[in-house]
Amino acid sequence: MSLNLRPEPLVRRIVATMVVVATTVSIGAVASSASPSTHSANRTVDYVQQLQSALTAAATQSTLPVNVTPPTSSWSQLWSDYGLPSVQTSCWDVAKTLDTIPKCVMGSHNATRTIVLAGDSQAFMWTPAFDAWGKANHVKVVVLTKAACQPWPDAHQSYYDGSTFPQCGVFQRAVVAKINSLHPAFVVVAGLAPQWPTGYCASCTSSQRLGMVSADVKAFISSIRASRAHVAVIEASPDFYTLASTHPLTDPLCLSAHPTSVQTCNSTPLSQLQNSLMKMALTSSALPKGVVVVPLDKLLCSAVSCPMVVGSRLVLSDNDHVSTQWAQYVVPAFTQIVNALHIN
């Protein structure tokens, strides 16, 4: 039995055909008209709360608008626009066979303060926001990511299709060595649970699986102790794959299938979309002392649901990855969350 019961979406993509509804609550004026520096300076504005209001309102929207971001003509090509296109080639190690460290720097290239963003696609999907935040806060962001290769080492790691994946272990060790030699101020890390071979741990209990994944996470954190960096772990994102096998409306294709009842797709309860295993493994109580959790899930879900679209913008590019446009749009709220943790 495989731990991750879904294909790696950036390699075997179920392309999202998403459309969007007009919401009665908008943060567009905030996110589109103000510069990142203005976002940091104007601390009286609660961008996270504004975004939460928009996410909540989206659950009750019904009809599709004419204009969407990105445009409908690009829906079948969202995978090629994943992350920042200008740096994708040098930053994103997609091929299974590659195990080299990407040469990727975002944010403020000449800054004296450096952080590392490490992990799999769950880390890379936030690069548009980290890039804007780094530029505004004079922080260099070194990105060390590989598709389908979570940052935490696991002796039974396999590829999403169940095949052997030795390149992931090589990449993981190279990332650790790079971090320990770089001595960044912070390491921000994100990733899914390791993919296990078919049949492995088939009779394991949920508690046993959690114990194994938690041990993997702690092993990674321990391995970069020599860097003396502070460590921040990004909260697990919502995962529509958790219901894909039993619920026909959880795939983002739901939106194009229900043009006059988008609320059917936008109102899935948060409790049904949480990656419970990773959420438990990445809670403050389960992590070593001093490690902080970055609640970026607040940029994707309200307290009760996780809409696929908000206003005229796609939230997700597939079942569990943030669209590039949404990651750019929520920079004000992203900045508020990250700066509150003193990562800057």
Task: Identify what each model region corresponds to.
Residues 2-344:
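Extracellular/periplasmic envelope-modification machinery, especially enzymes
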